[in-house]
Amino acid sequence: MVLREQEHEPFFIKIDGKWCQIDDAVLRSHPGGSAITTYKNMDATTVFHTFHTGSKEAYQWLTELKKECPTQEPEIPDIKDDPIKGIDDVNMGTFNISEKRSAQINKSFTDLRMRVRAEGLMDGSPLFYIRKILETIFTILFAFYLQYHTYYLPSAILMGVAWQQLGWLIHEFAHHQLFKNRYYNDLASYFVGNFLQGFSSGGWKEQHNVHHAATNVVGRDGDLDLVPFYATVAEHLNNYSQDSWVMTLFRWQHVHWTFMLPFLRLSWLLQSIIFVSQMPTHYYDYYRNTAIYEQVGLSLHWAWSLGQLYFLPDWSTRIMFFLVSHLVGGFLLSHVVTFNHYSVEKFALSSNIMSNYACLQIMTTRNMRPGRFIDWLWGGLNYQIEHHLFPTMPRHNLNTVMPLVKEFAAANGLPYMVDDYFTGFWLEIEQFRNIANVAAKLTKKIA
């Protein structure tokens, strides 16, 4: 959950061949928050239809918006940059697909999207999600049982497992994967997210929808912005003087990256508290209107979570339990969510990759090899390519759509990246090492 500052100036987006103006009133009322800003002055046709599958409210909103479309095509400024070779192009991919071929890929993906929907793969199974919720609740209750019988370390580890599995559930409900009525998905996300997990549903959406809309696009995807601790692209180094202590961190980031993974949950807990505390005055109407639900849910989470610590025998046990449960949960989450995108190239906004949604998702995502245990442990995110192409598709259908996605990629000459964990993790480390080498090169100039 890496939240970024947003610009709120009016802009245009193109949907179904029409340029629609997004003014302050429209932007504030957007239920998806900042995700709409990622396609500022761009064609958002495919991403709109992909993100809003089955949403009557979204299409009613679009119909009203199209009534106000300007009759003349607006002037859209070109996006240009001047990268320095050997520095700004490190870890950066290129998008060299012609407009004609890009249009063919877009049409092919639309056909795939229609086929997937016709085959019922966008429909969630209530029984599946009831089972997954009960699994996590029973895991927590068993951890309570172990704690009661003084098996404190196993109890803490089991709580960490529960934290991770709850992470997948808030992710799925925040993506509206089960209910067609999005209000019910929101309620479910408050329960598994705010109350059980301690993560803000709204904070998750605000960050994660932006990430999905502009995956690995520099300046758009907030997940790439890990400064001052890590730099995923050389552009991030420009924010610091060459003799800064931050540059020293960057020089060795590939070494200490692994050691920071367990702290992800603690970071997200803190960011959730900050986000929820600011919701009553948030720019977007949706977050202001749902602030009370999230505040109550998060307050109840910390009430029972701190109550669990209270019943431990002494402070040393409490500290051990807190750290073990949250660090285990943090590592189990982070070793998944960092694998899929940090191990692949990033793209400049000027690369034009955002003009083709399918290419964007396939070229910026790596799958983990599937298996029954991995499917459970990773919450289906080992099928990350499929998930990014169809974010509202329920977890239990991702393995079914995988052959269709492979077929689509092969037919359109697109890569389909899938590796075992250690191969993907090493590629992730290499990406951080590449930027570390750039930081070392820059700091040597002043030595």
Swiss-Prot record:
Annotated Cytochrome b5 heme-binding domain ranges read 1-80
Sorted keywords for this record are:
Fatty acid biosynthesis, Fatty acid metabolism, Lipid biosynthesis, Lipid metabolism, Membrane, Oxidoreductase, Transmembrane, Transmembrane helix
Subcellular compartments: Membrane
Describe which pathway this protein belongs to, using the record's wording.
Answer: Lipid metabolism; polyunsaturated fatty acid biosynthesis
**One GO biological process term:** lipid metabolic process
Disruption-associated phenotype: The fat-4 mutants lack detectable Delta(5)-unsaturated fatty acids.
Q: Where does this protein chiefly localize?
A: membrane
This protein's membrane topology, according to the annotation, is:
Multi-pass membrane protein
Per UniProt, the enzyme's principal EC class comes to oxidoreductase
Q: Give the matching Pfam families.
A: FA_desaturase (PF00487)
User: What family classification does the UniProt entry report for this protein?
Assistant: Belongs to the fatty acid desaturase type 1 family.
* Note, other: HPO-19 and T05H4.4 are cytochrome b5 reductases required for PUFA desaturation in Caenorhabditis elegans. HPO-19 knockdown or mutation alters FAT-4 desaturase activity.
**Name the UniProt record assigns to this protein:** Delta(5) fatty acid desaturase fat-4
Q: Which organism is it from?
A: Caenorhabditis elegans
